[in-house]
């Protein structure tokens, strides 16, 4: 069944690097060339070897002591005779085929429904999109609406009236009809499902309506179902995730990321004032670098739209309003950050790993020039090598070691274990999974980790993700006409924003929180930033005191900006690891996870920590997020010396310590 919202556009390393003309050999060009990466004692030494063989340098990658090159087989053989070469990768011309959407496999139907319903006392219009060439045939329709609106007087699909005889069984507030034979309505392309009501006797003249008062489910031939989502009220005024994550409270105190630069390595940036300018209207894009063409540019065209959406989540400078009145908060998490936009992904959202490494290298090389403190990596691919051998992971580790806090997506390949992507598998960085708020931002009891969010451990047994953050149906700006909007027109709001779901969005949100922390404490190291986030995250806890999700699903729990500021610790980030030795190759690190012969994953004592019953997808009467919510729902008296029976965790003691810390902060 087609997901209600699109998942993260996973950016796998599939495009090929384009050679430059700085060193070329006409004879070699006539042979079948290989696109390779040569790694060795230094980038300069590798360049000299390639050039002396007559090959073409495509990428200077000194950050990992490597070059990308275009070589014939004979030239490659010559280069590899040198003892200076440590490693080469010669299959860059054979990229993996982009995965097909499993929801569309062997299907003859693909219909999407607009996120917004047009409704009034007179009737409703719901726009549907048939993305296949053949007409989509409606088989069954289930609707509900406020009873005060009366009964269905008429219905049409794509302008064609539905036989009134099919509507005879409708009652006040509901309709469930099966269409058969020639009476089945059809949809070609874009069309509206339109209903008109016959008012009930004595119905009030004025009725207050919200989208969540309606429900709709349409089943089309070919195993194709589309449902109306509840939606957010006044979504154009409030994107809600700044409030859910606690960023709005910091905005009210002037904490907006001012003075901190975040680099977003993605598909580019649409030059929209609410993205390129801060809350004061000042330009805040310090540089735009195209890692595909290896040049600094004035405009970084975003054909895909993904990079613009990530930047919007992170830095949208538009004010949050209520009934048109500014609240003092903003739609983006860090609306005053400075930005560096780096493009390494194409119109399809695909990127070659040499371009990605070059993009990371440019960020590290210009860290001091632009005060780059955060690097957002909302992409991933299945790991091909251990983290210390993966070229992207190697560059990411060097970025972290240089003082840049790197935040990466866990991926959208869940719910199976060991689905964390690269570079999210790097143990040092902050890896983010996703939760959804089920369209109820004020109610945390229905917040859950959706199946798509990738799970750990990593192949090297490290616990990932590190934490989870809001990533469901995230509103933001993207370029009109971008690939995303063309492929998913149903996720465009009438006010121009675009709604996406995935760990990409959760990652951009966390990058924004990191910028808020660094504005308050600019001397924080990346390790201490990570410590503040994971030590203050709120785990999902069941009523029996056991974890609702394993650490491979939720990491340390749900991140909150206010808790990171008030309760976050230092000194716990990457304890037991040594990035200097890791980069030097003198020591590499395995995590604590165990993996049995059947592929089962665990941790020492995990069975005693996590509930055996799967956590509900939606409203839960058992699950609470955070120690405070868990303890305050209990009926027994609070005694830190007698923790919850059957639980290895002393949540009572943790509650007392958190409360004391908050009270200490409130004292003058």
Which residues make up each language-model segment?
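N-terminal domain-start motif of subtilase-like serine proteases
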Residues: 22-30, 51, 75, 99-100, ...
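C-terminal subdomain of the subtilisin-like protease fold in secreted/lumenal serine endopeptidases
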Residues: 26, 58-59, 101, 239, ...
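Autoinhibitory propeptides
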Residues: 44-101, 217-242, 247-252, 277, ...
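Short beta-strand elements of extracellular/lumenal beta-sandwich folds
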Residues: 119-135
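Catalytic-core segments of hydrolase enzymes
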Residues: 239, 321-322, 370-476, 535-537
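Subtilisin-like serine protease catalytic core
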Residues: 249-287, 296-354, 368-374, 401, ...
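Extracellular S/T/G-rich loop segment that most often corresponds to the catalytic His/Ser-adjacent loop
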Residues: 266, 284-285, 424-515, 519, ...
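Hydrolase catalytic cores
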Residues: 311-313, 340-346, 375, 419-422, ...
């Amino acid at each position: 069944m087609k997901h209600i919202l699109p998942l993260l556009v996973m950016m796998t390393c599939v495009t090929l690097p384009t050679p430059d003309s700085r060193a070329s050999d006409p004879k070699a060009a006539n042979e079948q060339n290989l696109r390779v990466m040569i790694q060795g004692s230094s980038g300069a030494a590798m360049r000299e070897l390639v050039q002396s063989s007559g090959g073409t340098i495509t990428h200077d990658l000194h950050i990992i002591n490597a070059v990308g090159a275009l070589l014939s087989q004979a030239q490659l053989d010559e280069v590899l005779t040198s003892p200076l070469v440590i490693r080469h990768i010669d299959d860059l011309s054979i990229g993996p085929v982009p995965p097909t959407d499993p929801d569309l496999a062997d299907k003859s139907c693909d219909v999407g429904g607009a996120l917004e319903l047009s409704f009034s006392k007179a009737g409703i219009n719901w726009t549907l999109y048939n993305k296949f060439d053949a007409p989509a045939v409606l088989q069954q329709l289930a609707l509900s609406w406020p009873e005060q609106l009366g009964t269905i007087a008429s219905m049409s699909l794509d302008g064609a009236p539905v036989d009134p005889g099919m509507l005879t069984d409708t009652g006040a507030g509901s309709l469930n009809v099966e269409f058969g034979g020639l009476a089945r309505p059809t949809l070609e392309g874009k069309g509206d499902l339109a209903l008109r009501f016959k008012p009930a006797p004595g119905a009030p003249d004025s009725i207050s309506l919200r989208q969540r008062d309606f429900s709709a489910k349409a089943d089309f031939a070919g195993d194709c179902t589309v449902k109306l989502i509840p939606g957010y009220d006044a979504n154009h005024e409030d994107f809600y995730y700044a409030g859910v994550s606690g960023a709005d409270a910091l905005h009210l105190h002037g904490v907006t990321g001012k003075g901190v630069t975040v680099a977003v390595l993605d598909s580019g940036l649409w030059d929209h004032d609410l993205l390129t300018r801060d809350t004061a209207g000042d330009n805040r894009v310090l540089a735009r670098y195209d890692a595909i063409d290896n040049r600094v540019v004035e405009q970084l065209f975003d054909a895909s739209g993904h990079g613009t959406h990530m930047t919007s989540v992170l830095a949208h400078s538009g004010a949050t309003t209520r009934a048109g009145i500014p609240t003092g908060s903003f739609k983006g998490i860090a609306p005053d950050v400075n930005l560096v936009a780096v493009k390494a992904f194409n119109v399809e959202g695909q990127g070659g790993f040499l371009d990605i490494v070059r993009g990371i290298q440019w960020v590290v090389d210009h860290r001091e020039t632009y005060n780059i403190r955060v690097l957002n990596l909302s992409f991933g691919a299945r790991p091909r090598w251990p983290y210390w051998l993966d070229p992207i992971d190697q560059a990411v580790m060097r970025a972290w070691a240089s003082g840049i806090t790197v935040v990466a997506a866990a991926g959208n390949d869940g719910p199976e274990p060991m689905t964390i992507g690269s570079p999210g598998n790097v143990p040092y960085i902050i890896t983010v999974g996703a939760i959804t708020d089920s369209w109820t931002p004020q109610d945390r009891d229905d917040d859950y980790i959706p199946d798509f969010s990738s799970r750990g451990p990593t192949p090297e047994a490290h616990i990932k993700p590190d934490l989870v953050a809001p990533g469901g149906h995230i509103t933001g700006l993207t370029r009109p006409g971008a690939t995303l909007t063309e492929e998913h027109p149903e996720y465009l709001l009438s006010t121009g924003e675009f709604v996406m779901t995935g760990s990409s969005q959760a990652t951009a949100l966390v990058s924004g929180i990191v910028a808020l922390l660094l504005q308050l404490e600019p001397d924080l190291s990346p390790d201490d930033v990570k410590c503040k986030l994971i030590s203050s995250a709120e785990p999902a806890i069941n009523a029996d005191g056991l974890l609702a999700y394993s650490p491979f699903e939720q990491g340390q729990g749900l991140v909150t900006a206010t808790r990171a500021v008030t309760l976050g610790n230092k000194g716990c980030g990457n304890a037991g690891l040594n990035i200097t030795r890791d980069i030097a190759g003198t020591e590499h690190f395995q995590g604590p996870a165990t993996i049995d012969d059947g592929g089962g994953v665990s941790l020492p004592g995990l069975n005693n920590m996590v509930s055996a019953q799967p956590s509900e997808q939606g409203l839960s009467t058992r699950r609470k997020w955070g120690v405070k919510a868990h303890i305050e729902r209990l009926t027994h008296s609070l005694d830190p010396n007698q923790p919850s029976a059957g639980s290895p965790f002393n949540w009572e003691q943790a509650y007392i310590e958190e409360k004391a810390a908050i009270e200490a902060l409130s004292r003058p």
